């Protein structure tokens, strides 16, 4: 499915806007004239509909019987080998018992990240594929390539940043259809029709994409999505980078010996602060709902950005009526976290040229904050 979009990524020419001649935000032309005189779209993305592929899971005997695995193979308490063993899954079951009563209803995870296609080149090019995977299947199946569905490709060359929501509109429409209207599906393993219900459980991404998907940007002093405005981060005097050194002690028990260590962590500092409050789902939604969607108006930096909050938008995922009821909405990809940490540590210890974090400014900052 080919969908045209604005040259600047402001909007999709989709549904009510499919016949517009120019972007409703920046007024860039929808089409350009080819040498033959025909109208040719300036930019287009490719979208692969989700619903037909979910229905095909029940049309094959290779997958249909396994779509009930999460329900028929319960693990004992304390054992976790599948997302269905986690509290987020069980919480959703308790919140929507009608959904949980039908084990064939599908739970999905979404993943997206940018990459440079073909090879690294001098001219930067950022392409963003979006993947969905059903978690009903057993662990040895659900993360294999036949069951990781490419949903759309967000073309480059520029990183979409917070405008990534623009490209999610067709997916959100399908997810709302799967939740509100449901889809009649034939289950070949049980030889019967049923109304398929599906839910997006969470997203998985690296820390940068986390900000793009959630709306809370991961830059500046307020980058931490848990501490939010209660962060204890500071700017390095010489390096001028944001630092979260010694922010972890506040999470220890109040009588923990580490809290009283004056020089073992940040120089000449003890920590008596309580951990930051953990906001409930309702409190997060109460904050996010006041910000506009990038699909409805052009983004801008709101009052207090970077000082009182890091919100840049209301994420498009809030259009899913059940999104505010999830216990866990966004997950970090451990592969990126581990790789970035290892690369920085290894390159610094081994003094890899142009990749080490050990530099003059870092050396000047050390005596400022450490004994």
Task: Locate each region found by the language model.
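Domain-level cores of phosphate- or acyl-group-handling catalytic modules
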Residues: 1-371
């Amino acid at each position: 499915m080919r969908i045209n979009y604005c040259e600047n990524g402001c909007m999709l020419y989709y549904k009510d806007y499919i016949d517009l001649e120019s972007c409703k935000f920046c007024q860039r032309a929808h089409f350009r004239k080819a040498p033959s005189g025909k109208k040719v779209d300036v930019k287009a993305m490719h979208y692969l509909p989700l619903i037909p592929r979910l229905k095909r899971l029940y049309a094959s005997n290779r997958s249909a019987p396994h779509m009930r695995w999460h329900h028929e193979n319960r693990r004992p308490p304390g054992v976790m080998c599948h997302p269905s063993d986690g509290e987020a899954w069980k919480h959703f079951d308790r919140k929507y018992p009608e959904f949980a009563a039908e084990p064939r209803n599908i739970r999905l995870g979404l993943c997206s990240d940018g990459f440079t296609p073909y090879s690294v080149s001098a001219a930067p090019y950022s392409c963003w594929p979006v993947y969905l995977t059903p978690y009903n299947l057993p662990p040895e199946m659900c993360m294999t390539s036949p069951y990781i569905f490419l949903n759309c490709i967000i073309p480059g060359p520029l990183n979409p940043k917070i405008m990534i929501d623009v490209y999610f509109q067709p997916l959100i429409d399908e997810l709302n259809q799967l939740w509100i209207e449901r889809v009649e599906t034939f289950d070949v393993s049980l030889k019967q029709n049923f109304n398929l219900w599906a839910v997006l459980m969470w997203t998985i991404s690296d820390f940068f994409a986390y900000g793009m998907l959630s709306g809370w940007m991961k830059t500046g002093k307020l980058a931490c999505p848990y501490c939010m405005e209660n962060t204890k981060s500071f700017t390095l005097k010489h390096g001028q980078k944001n630092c979260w050194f010694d922010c972890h002690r506040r999470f220890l028990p109040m009588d923990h010996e580490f809290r009283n260590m004056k020089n073992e962590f940040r120089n000449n500092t003890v920590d008596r602060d309580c951990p930051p409050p953990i906001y409930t789902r309702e409190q997060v939604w109460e904050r996010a709902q006041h910000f506009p969607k990038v699909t409805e108006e052009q983004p801008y930096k709101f009052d207090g950005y970077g000082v009182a909050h890091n919100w840049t938008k209301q994420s498009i995922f809030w259009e899913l009526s059940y999104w505010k009821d999830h216990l866990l909405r966004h997950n970090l990809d451990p592969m990126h976290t581990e790789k970035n940490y290892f690369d920085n540590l290894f390159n610094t210890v081994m003094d890899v040229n142009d990749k080490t974090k050990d530099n003059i400014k870092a050396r000047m900052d050390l005596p400022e904050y450490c004994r």
